[in-house]
UniProtKB/Swiss-Prot annotation:
Gene Ontology molecular functions: translation elongation factor activity
Entries under CDD domains matching the protein: S1_EF-P_repeat_1 (cd04470), S1_EF-P_repeat_2 (cd05794)
Protein name: Elongation factor P
Name of the gene this protein is made from: efp
Family: Belongs to the elongation factor P family.
Amino acid sequence: MKINGNEIRPGNVIEHNGGLWVAVKTNAVKPGKGGAYNQVELKNLIDGTKLNERFRSAETVEKVRLEQKDFTFLYEQGDALVFMDSETYEQLELQKDFVGDRAAFLQDGMTVTVELYQEKPIGISLPPQVTLQVAEADPVVKGQTAASSYKPAVLENGVRILVPPFVSAGERIVVDTDEITYLRRAD
């Protein structure tokens, strides 16, 4: 579907220069001299490169509609991650580098959303939060709690994050999967 350059909003996926790009930030600019334009920060969905582009109001771009399907994570096989379509029960195999650092947060039976373009996977979204157990946490040094400080900890999946001083090994905590940061203790 074609849209004008001034209608591009953050989150829109467009076809530009032969690739698929997601709009990260947009800024409508109305200079004193010349026509208005939309300054858009784009991120390539395939390789992650960023690009700043100006779109005049009169320009048209192709807005791409991505299909989103729910898949269940089944298991890890070497460098591949195996998922199952929740509706058709077909299996989908993705490489670990496709998921990136967040692959460590995948748990058996976890539901993820895979974005498809012409039946080809181009993106994956994990749940925003996961609950994990702290495997190792450094002890708190007395007198170090006067200022807000964090200490390093290792989670059960091997990921290192910073946690507040009161968190100790064996506790379950909630972690943000996008920022890979501590959120709170688990209930």
